[in-house]
Curated annotation (Swiss-Prot):
Residues at the catalytic site: 376 (proton acceptor), 602 (proton acceptor)
A Pfam family this chain is assigned to: Ala_racemase_C
Protein family membership: In the N-terminal section; belongs to the acyltransferase 3 family.
Keywords: Antibiotic resistance, Cell membrane, Isomerase, Membrane, Pyridoxal phosphate, Transmembrane, Transmembrane helix
Region annotated Racemase, chain positions: 336-711
EC number of this enzyme: 5.1.1.-
UniProt KW Cell membrane keyword: yes
Protein name: Amino-acid racemase
Positions bearing N6-(pyridoxal phosphate)lysine: 376
Broad class of enzyme this protein falls into: isomerase
Amino acid sequence: MTKNESYSGIDYFRFIAALLIVAIHTSPLFSFSETGNFIFTRIVAPVAVPFFFMTSGFFLISRYTCNAEKLGAFIKKTTLIYGVAILLYIPINVYNGYFKMDNLLPNIIKDIVFDGTLYHLWYLPASIIGAAIAWYLVKKVHYRKAFLIASILYIIGLFGDSYYGIVKSVSCLNVFYNLIFQLTDYTRNGIFFAPIFFVLGGYISDSPNRYRKKNYIRIYSLFCLMFGKTLTLQHFDIQKHDSMYVLLLPSVWCLFNLLLHFRGKRRTGLRTISLDQLYHSSVYDCCNTIVCAELLHLQSLLVENSLVHYIAVCFASVVLAVVITALLSSLKPKKAKHTADTDRAYLEINLNNLEHNVNTLQKAMSPKCELMAVVKAEAYGHGMYEVTTYFEPIGVFYLAVATIDEGIRLRKYGIFSEILILGYTSPSRAKELCKFELTQTLIDYRYLLLLNKQGYDIKAHIKIDTGMHRLGFSTEDKDKILAAFFLKHIKVAGIFTHLCAADSLEEKEVAFTNKPIGSFYKVLDWPKSSGLNIPKVNIQTSYGLWNIQSWNVIYQSGVALYGVLRSTNDKTKLETDLRACSFLKAKVVLIRKIKQGGSVGYSRAFTATRDSLIAILPIGYADGFPRNLSCGNSYVLIGGRQAPIVGKICMDQLAVDVTDIPNVKTGSIATLIGKDGKEEITAPMVAESAESITNELLSRMEHRLNIIRRA
């Protein structure tokens, strides 16, 4: 994901694009060459507005979303700017006689919604409408269909803009466009023009390997083609307006990808200045024309000379933007150094380590094997949204969850990978299985019949019980297993088993595991001998890959993906360089001075044997940190040193002794799982101290901990 990366190329071009927009409204070369001015203002400069749309889409639109907060914030901010701009330009509207028009109220509504109350303000309602359309299209139908729908809208707009002369001669189309023009003066608006650029911006952001060095040549070639085509359209006089061209799309696409090459320090000032300049250039255009020309008698210099006029407008606009930026900056309260995400306790998720583990496991598998990521229980406490939205871009396209509700959440996040539900789903929810295209595990013959009886087409995997004796068909149920292939509403897409003893290298356990493996492969022969296509085969266990790894199957990997073993004593046949992905941390919120003999916590479980410094951490067993680590059974790391847990761990807090650790203060970071200096506490170590396993420890976390993604 790229939303928080810094792209200085985009920041610099924002400023250039703002200057281009000023050029569109001031025609800087008109005094010297009408053709040159046309080329500059009607071929080169029009890339500016689509660039702004695409930039907004790049940082706003994503198929991976867990809510609409970013969209809401964007619309709220843009609406506020639009409202201020409308009020700011009322004097100019009065001067131009805007309020003397016929049908004033419906025209004001039309202008506010589509065209802007002053010509150049159309960009703001277009941004609001275009962002909303693009966001919901991508959310509901993914990029391919979203692009198709946005393209259709763009084509409709195209024939109401640059190609209007063609459709005007076709009576039915002319009627259609006349209806459109009763609602909006132009098709260059938030419905027809903006959505496709927002969609493309989001697609670029979500897509890996998007940079191409050949963009220099492509941009030059496309602009040459657009130059010829635009002059042709002008020559035949078929344009109603000149904002929308076919070649504008690939031109802005290549330009934007080129700008992504340039990384560096964020230029927040340039962003704000270019924004203010864009919205205020027309003010100074009017001021230069009216005030300077009439009061200072400089018409020949500031009005009749178009280039000087343009420079004056740009200069005045930039000065105003700098002043406004400085004023707003001085009035804006300074942000605290910490963020809300890390002000209490939090999990750090290292995405680089996650990708490393995926690559390591894939290399350990035979070439025909594939990886299915088990993301149940909030991806083993790592955050289901944070993890799954990272898996697809790095090439993991099979996911497994425990419940239907987990699967539905993934679909609502924007996940399009195959999702297998490992556990039971009530047959009464078959409609949801079908609607969200989830793959259901068939747990026995009776369940199979009930699911088919619901009347919804359901994709399913048959589970074979090879010794776990929980869910699944017996290896003796040949007829019942084969029956699944012939039911009307069940589409068998896979067969899998769950090895119950693959985590052990003891000879008797290895022998036990090998026996059901043979039975499982015997089951796989039944469909083949009956002339049926053998569906995908998968094995449910990380330890099956580590200790046996001899099949051409899909491996369901859970704990291995997250770089940990179940316990510190586990040994595996295959040694892999896996790296832990989650690190639990909390901030010191208070330091208490406890005199010798003083106590801390419930039941006075800790009594100080000396004058002590006790640090209070805002994390407890409600955050998933085990209560049986109380009273010195574990420790945390602060400043690279061990701080023992004292007293009983509470629901929301715990106390640690920092008497022997220098420079501990409020705000110091305590590491409960992770590395600090030369010291390290691993998840298996904490789990062992709590007399548990890593799976349980991690899956109990996340529910109210903030998750910070590090890449």
